[in-house]
A protein has these predicted regions:
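Mg2+-dependent endonuclease catalytic cores in nucleic-acid-processing enzymes, primarily RNase H-like
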Residues: 2-124
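Residues within alpha-helical segments
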Residues: 86, 133-137
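Acidic two-metal-ion nuclease catalytic site recognized across multiple nuclease folds
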Residues: 137-163
Length: 163
């Protein structure tokens, strides 16, 4: 799920990819998505969930190597899916009595499937798009922003690696 934040403070869901794939195909689609998003949007952070235990650490290391050259984080998930979804859900719904929340969605072929999963959460069997949306939203609001490299040719840790 690709989410951005507009200058006016509203959020935009710009893309959703939801497919059942083999492990190798998942890695390939993640890499291709990183390539496409970087070309189209320039600065995109990719946040991937890290499963607990050694297998999760190994998988995270594998993704970091695969996605060298991209801004990538593998973050261990904590808490249940419902709790993790609450911050994004609050922005989606907005304040009680309001017509809409603070999230816009680009019109695209994936809209119906995306809306159906969000609307049936948490009772639905599939929760991947909700989980991915929550994770993307948390990444935007975590305050972990990265500055662009300076254009004057100077490059130092203070100006480039600021978090």
């Amino acid at each position: 799920v690709l989410i951005g934040k507009r200058k006016n403070g509203r959020y935009i869901v710009a893309d959703v990819i939801n497919k059942r794939l083999s492990s190798a195909d998942v890695r390939e689609i993640i890499k291709q998505t990183c390539i496409t998003d970087k070309a189209k949007y320039k600065r995109v952070a990719t946040r991937l969930p890290q499963d607990p235990g050694q297998a999760g650490k190994d998988q995270a290391q594998s993704f970091l190597k695969l996605l060298a050259g991209f801004t990538v984080k593998c973050i261990p998930e904590s808490g249940d899916k419902v709790t993790r979804a609450e911050p994004f859900s609050a922005q989606w719904l907005g304040l009680e009595g309001m017509d809409k929340g603070n999230v816009d969605v680009l019109i695209a072929p994936w809209n119906e499937m995306y809306f159906n999963q969000l609307e049936s959460f948490p009772e639905s069997k599939f929760k991947d798009m909700v989980d991915a949306s929550s994770s993307a939203f948390i990444e935007i609001e975590s305050g972990n922003t990265y500055s662009a490299p300076p254009t004057d040719g100077g490059l130092n840790k203070e100006s480039y690696w600021r978090k």
